[in-house]
Amino acid sequence: MTKSELISKLAERFPQLLAKDAELVVKIILDAMAKSLARGERIEIRGFGSFDLNYRPSRVGRNPKSGEKVHVPEKYVPHFKAGKKMRELIDSSHKQHNLLDQATG
């Protein structure tokens, strides 16, 4: 799902919202989440999942074209962990999909 699709679904679900208002709501939420992560804060949305930062130490990597060794500096990367309800929903959905594939396969 893209940001545009999310905005469209929000506008469909809430007809009283104009498309530009739905777009603004999505933008405000995503900006707030990005700023929170940039401050090093953890984001938890119960039933959906949590976002936090993982530390990656510096290391020696390789340039894929030349094979030359390259220093890769330390960094923090965003990490998402799905909540229990989401994991269960995804798992049951894929199990049903696999059963349908086997039945028609």
From Swiss-Prot:
<dbReference type="GO" id="GO:0005694">
    <property type="term" value="C:chromosome"/>
</dbReference>
<keyword id="KW-0804">Transcription</keyword>
<dbReference type="GO" id="GO:0006310">
    <property type="term" value="P:DNA recombination"/>
</dbReference>
<keyword id="KW-0810">Translation regulation</keyword>
<protein>
    <recommendedName>
        <fullName>Integration host factor subunit beta</fullName>
    </recommendedName>
</protein>
<keyword id="KW-0233">DNA recombination</keyword>
<dbReference type="GO" id="GO:0006355">
    <property type="term" value="P:regulation of DNA-templated transcription"/>
</dbReference>
<dbReference type="InterPro" id="IPR005685">
    <property type="entry name" value="IHF_beta"/>
</dbReference>
<comment type="subunit">
    <text>Heterodimer of an alpha and a beta chain.</text>
</comment>
<dbReference type="InterPro" id="IPR010992">
    <property type="entry name" value="IHF-like_DNA-bd_dom_sf"/>
</dbReference>
<keyword id="KW-0238">DNA-binding</keyword>
<dbReference type="GO" id="GO:0005829">
    <property type="term" value="C:cytosol"/>
</dbReference>
<dbReference type="GO" id="GO:0030527">
    <property type="term" value="F:structural constituent of chromatin"/>
</dbReference>
<dbReference type="GO" id="GO:0003677">
    <property type="term" value="F:DNA binding"/>
</dbReference>
<comment type="similarity">
    <text>Belongs to the bacterial histone-like protein family.</text>
</comment>
<dbReference type="InterPro" id="IPR000119">
    <property type="entry name" value="Hist_DNA-bd"/>
</dbReference>
<keyword id="KW-0805">Transcription regulation</keyword>
<dbReference type="GO" id="GO:0006417">
    <property type="term" value="P:regulation of translation"/>
</dbReference>
<dbReference type="Pfam" id="PF00216">
    <property type="entry name" value="Bac_DNA_binding"/>
</dbReference>
<comment type="function">
    <text>This protein is one of the two subunits of integration host factor, a specific DNA-binding protein that functions in genetic recombination as well as in transcriptional and translational control.</text>
</comment>
